[in-house]
Amino acid sequence: MSDHDSGNARRGRASFGAFVRKPVERGAPAGAAAEQGGLDAVQALPDDAVEVGAVVDAYGLKGWVKVATHADAGRGGDALLSARRWWLEKGTQRFSARIVQSKTHGDTVVAQPAGVGDRDAALALRGFRVFVRREDFPALAADEFYWVDLIGLDVVNEQSATLGKVVGMIDNGAHSIMRVEYPSVGKDGRPAAAERLIPFVGVYVKTVDQAARRIVVDWEADY
């Protein structure tokens, strides 16, 4: 069993929906991007939009942008490569952009949004966060999962004891680990949240039922 940023989780370092954002430059003043053609202003992002990266620079002279992906390019970056439409957001500015071409470039993804015709127009997009719709993610094999789809699932053991809810994922380089949060009591006697870490590997994870929003594990509550 494996989970994915996009591709095998053992290769990726960050996740869609559970990532550490990379720092990005502030970029052009607010409103500069809106002055260029080719981008459609929108009031809101799609309901299934997932943040997958941020525009960090222009690429070349012909309107291409360079995106630092929240998951490794070619792995988590696969969603950027497969989606033909991106959504961009910075502050109160939101745009929909049709992507003409995209490809990996080192550890980034570079792309040509329609209507962004030169380097200055591309530079105006620095600092915009990039989203794609979950439905545009590449399909995975039956035993593979995107981290964003695991966040929020309930975790129970084989004796039906409730262990908590997945609130995040960690990649330790060898495999992924679920951060499972559950209610507890703090040192002051007040209700508090506690966390247990469960490796997301086949020896412990028995079933993942996304429809039922439940993960069954071979794990005891007192581990």
Swiss-Prot record:
Any one Gene Ontology BP term: rRNA processing
Function recorded in the entry: An accessory protein needed during the final step in the assembly of 30S ribosomal subunit, possibly for assembly of the head region. Essential for efficient processing of 16S rRNA. May be needed both before and after RbfA during the maturation of 16S rRNA. It has affinity for free ribosomal 30S subunits but not for 70S ribosomes.
Keywords for the protein's UniProt record, in alphabetical order: Chaperone, Cytoplasm, Ribosome biogenesis, rRNA processing
Key word Ion transport present: no
Similarity field: Belongs to the RimM family.
Residues annotated as signal peptide: none
Subcellular locations according to the entry: Cytoplasm
Domain remark from Swiss-Prot or TrEMBL: The PRC barrel domain binds ribosomal protein uS19.
InterPro entries: PRC_barrel-like_sf, PRC_RimM, RimM, RimM_N, RimM_N_sf, Transl_B-barrel_sf
Gene Ontology CC: cytoplasm; ribosome
Positions of the PRC barrel domain: 142-223
Name the record gives this protein: Ribosome maturation factor RimM
